[in-house]
């Protein structure tokens, strides 16, 4: 019914059906939980539909609607959020309504405000989202500790990151005052002990993608031409980025990504065993938007490209420490080794002058391809992938015949599932 009402509203609201939105708002703020929930659901679909209209007159009408809708919906969201925190036993209904209210506010703030931070209500929403998200994470942990379902709390927490990401993408210059709190919030929860017990995969992906979006935002890059005009917001955004990504935070983030996120998990190994071809192809396309491993890899590459001078020594030190340890078929050591090799492969173009790949290949990598222990398959696969990454960067022609023989031997001498995975990983 809510979707049907929204489809009618697309053509009739607000001109032919002016009472629709005021009626929904009044029911939303009422005392009947079920009626309030249904009104919020309908309002969400109506706002979502109206926000998708692109004609100038429709955009103007939606901006006017946003100015009238933001205050009551914001007040309802704040009330429902507080109710969910104060009554955890009854949090399910409160959380569902708070989530619907926040989804509506997300559309209003992103698509209904020309500059969100110039609207007092939109500014309140965005600045409050950091603390509200932290509270949602705490509520999720409390629900899990009590043995209760926490799926709604997870969706609610993730929605806060989507609000920030959409605002950054649609209004990058208006987002400048939020860059610092966004980076601090994401880094503290993902890369420090404060996030222990609070994180889950979708939220972690949302935080990492926010950091990457700030790094890669075109509007936050100063012009290369010294004579080009410089927007004050652009220069301020660049200053905030450079101040935040100092040497110590960068080193901490780099090490954490490689040691905590890059190693394969038990689930990864199970997926590999179940369907090798599917496993090596699942990280393609835009998997970084939703999956943790490709998300962390994309962030690592973005960090390395922008801060190569600071991060190259860190990664080289990790590589030296890894190579100082003899190859071991013990699974945990093999996984740690594979993670470092993965990082070196992703940074191949940035490490051209730093790594003697020919020497490394002859003194270690080719010998590692000959290790047949089942646990060492993760390193063998990564070595083949690593050679594929470096072959177009820095590999002597005289070594290629030996490389071909070693790779062929590594692929053909193992079981069918592992062999197909090794064969496919050359294109990963």
Please tell me what each predicted stretch does.
Residues 31, 89, 93, 148, ...:
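Structural signature of alpha-solenoid helical repeat scaffolds
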Residues 113-116, 125, 133-143, 182, ...:
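Extended alpha-helical solenoid scaffold regions that build the rod-like backbones
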Residues 163, 295, 411-428:
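Short, compositionally biased segments
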Residues 116-117, 126-202, 213:
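Non-catalytic protein-protein interaction scaffold segments in large eukaryotic complex-forming proteins
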Residues 55-63, 86-94, 112-123, 143-150, ...:
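Alpha-helical rod/repeat scaffolding segments in eukaryotic adaptors/tethers
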Residues 2-88, 195-361:
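Alpha-helical repeat/alpha-solenoid scaffolds of the HEAT/ARM/MIF4G superfamily
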Residues 1-9, 13, 344-348, 362-391:
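Amphipathic alpha-helical interface segments within eukaryotic helical scaffold
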Residues 36, 94, 98, 153, ...:
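Residue-level detector of extended alpha-helical repeat arrays and alpha-solenoid scaffolds
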